[in-house]
Amino acid sequence: MTVMEHKKAAQLDLSQHGLSNVTEVLRNPSYDVLFEEETRPDLEGYERGVMTELGSVAVDTGIFTGRSPKDKYIVKDETTKDTLWWSDQGKNDNKAITPAVWDDLKALVTEQLSGKRLFVIDGFCGANPDTRLSVRVITEVAWQAHFVKNMFIRPTDEELESFEPDFVVMNGAKATNPNYEAQGLNSENFVAFNLTERVQIIGGTWYGGEMKKGMFAMMNYLLPLKGIASMHCSANVGKEGDVAVFFGLSGTGKTTLSTDPKRQLIGDDEHGWDDDGIFNFEGGCYAKTIRLSKEAEPDIFNAIRRDALLENVTVRNDGSIDFDDGSKTENTRVSYPIYHIDNIVKPISKAGHANKVIFLTADAFGVLPPVAKLTPEQTKYHFLSGFTAKLAGTERGITEPTPTFSAAFGAAFLTLHPTQYAEVLVKRMEAAGAEAYIVNTGWNGTGKRISIQDTRGIIDAILDGSIDNVETKNIPVFNLEVPTSLPGVDTSILDPRDTYTDPLQWDSKAEDLAQRFIKNFAQYTDNDEGKALVKAGPQLD
């Protein structure tokens, strides 16, 4: 440890977090220290990292290769009982637990971490100093500390001197809960939050994304209550300062499409929109690597080097990586500090107001067009619907594309009612004069997925404005206006009906999908605003 690292660790007393007899604290260690720690030859099982030929370390997360939403819990108390969007009020994973159950779970984690040599990473969630969360993550596993160092915003030495956490994450991945059945819980594993104590605890799952997404869920609670949009989206900015945000569930293309050599990346997954504009929550990227190639995604491929951390990829004996192998999971990932992408907004990941808002969907039915411009009413409708296909591997038990509706393109991370996010977003869009588009990165009548080249051509046309200067035609049932041609895009795919040998096939699939949209949206029709939006969705005669 350097003198500064000794100084940082010496100042830290973890007894305030319920931990006792801690043998050593490594606080915000350097990447070199983490590299030595996570590749130690004496490490076993999921603690052990292996070296790859690209210079990055690779780890396995065991059976937990994605988030475990069925094991997510939030304490129901005076703070949350009337504000939180609970699982008995809609389609979400915010299952309530009592303070007593919380105390039992927390005791399991503090017992697991006490008496150990611990890593502590202090960082920020949110690039705006006025609204950011100061987050402290405590773990006994070196690579989990590495993941957090990659993903959260790294404080300066001066900021560390006065660092006081707003939220504490205690990751006791080795701890499991033997009493889960008596407590009415799903399994021995748990990811639990207490908004009064401002603490997250993790037990049983080794998946790194639980720490990142846990803090996203907390930002999703705190920011909209202040009138700030909290969004599951990527964002980038052009040479003229024009900002675009890309909403979408995991695997729909947020990271890939926002990582564009012609534009500077603000961030790839989680953002806020306040009076100054768009700002990133994170200090890193968490990109899918399944079937990654240097030719198709050079920026992401080149980011996989020393200090990047690979998850669940297949590493051959010679250290080479088989990115095409999805035998462990389709949800293979890499985390890296955002500066591994050359073309980023510096020094702070923030920019002005967005003028293009893009909803990415992966339509497993082959019904929706590759692109359509949305009216303000359609924007609200499709934001609340959040239609996509769950893609293989981002959650346990999902291996084939499955159609789903996820409010705000991120229902798994929402902690307030979806209409609150829609209201704040639309207010921000109206104030900025932003336009919205829906872009389908999924399948069509050919049975194949729309090519990344065609999708990039569509995004280019949206961002440079050329999509606004072409002829359009109306797609029935969904009442969407689609272009008849776009530069650099295969014209034959723009009307999805043209991709079927028999157009009647599209008609029957469109009716099926429309009925699903209508059934899902019924949950929002218990007030006048929701009823008024029904006209903006699909219509069946």
From Swiss-Prot:
Catalytic activity line of the entry: oxaloacetate + ATP = phosphoenolpyruvate + ADP + CO2
Q: Where does substrate bind?
A: R67, Y207, K213, R333
Q: Which PROSITE patterns match?
A: PEPCK_ATP
Q: Name one Pfam family in it.
A: PEPCK_ATP
Where is the protein found, in the record's own terms? Answer: Cytoplasm
SUPFAM superfamilies, per the entry: PEP carboxykinase N-terminal domain (SSF68923), PEP carboxykinase-like (SSF53795)
Q: Keywords, A to Z?
A: ATP-binding, Cytoplasm, Decarboxylase, Gluconeogenesis, Lyase, Manganese, Metal-binding, Nucleotide-binding
Its EC number(s):
4.1.1.49
For activity, the cofactor(s) needed are: Mn(2+)
GO MF annotations in UniProt: ATP binding; metal ion binding; phosphoenolpyruvate carboxykinase (ATP) activity
Could you tell me the superkingdom of the organism this chain comes from? Bacteria
Its pathway is: Carbohydrate biosynthesis; gluconeogenesis
The note describing how and how many cofactors are bound reads: Binds 1 Mn(2+) ion per subunit.
Signal peptide range = none
Biological process terms from the Gene Ontology for this record are: gluconeogenesis
Report whether Amino-acid biosynthesis shows up as a keyword of the record. no
- Sequence similarity: Belongs to the phosphoenolpyruvate carboxykinase (ATP) family.
Its recorded name reads Phosphoenolpyruvate carboxykinase (ATP)
Q: What is the organism field in this record?
A: Aliivibrio salmonicida (strain LFI1238)
